[in-house]
Amino acid sequence: MKKLLILVAFVALSFGTFAQSVSESTITKRENRRGMVLKEWNTPAGDKRAFLDRKTTYDEFGRKIEEIEYASYGQKWRVVYEYPANSDITAKVVREIEYNDRDKVVRIRKYEYDEDGSKVRQLNYYPNGKLESVKTFEYVPK
């Protein structure tokens, strides 16, 4: 009986971990991006001065945690990505917070995944927490 309980607990924990897992290629990319800040520069045709177009910040696991898009006047928008507490390199984003050019929250997105780790729902909320819309993902085999 004790072995059965241990087996059930192991299987349950495995499904929780597996649901958040990402592909091997994603893990390799994340390993190469640990603690990185990626800056994208844009140079208009006929101009020699480049301007910062986008900045992406990665955490110690190589997961994207912030992305900022710039315009000539400064920040256009910013998105902060959140992962489950105490998660590791294999975790998928569970929440995004989008800010406008004045750094005010304009939208919050929450994500749900199935046991295979595929995204199944995206819940979009207004800044006040009221549900705006729900996007459902359907995977149709060939």
Identify the role of each PLM range:
Residues 4-13:
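Sec-dependent N-terminal signal peptides
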Residues 15-19:
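Sec/Tat signal peptide C-region and signal peptidase I cleavage site
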Residues 20-142:
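Buried hydrophobic residues that stabilize the cores of well-folded domains
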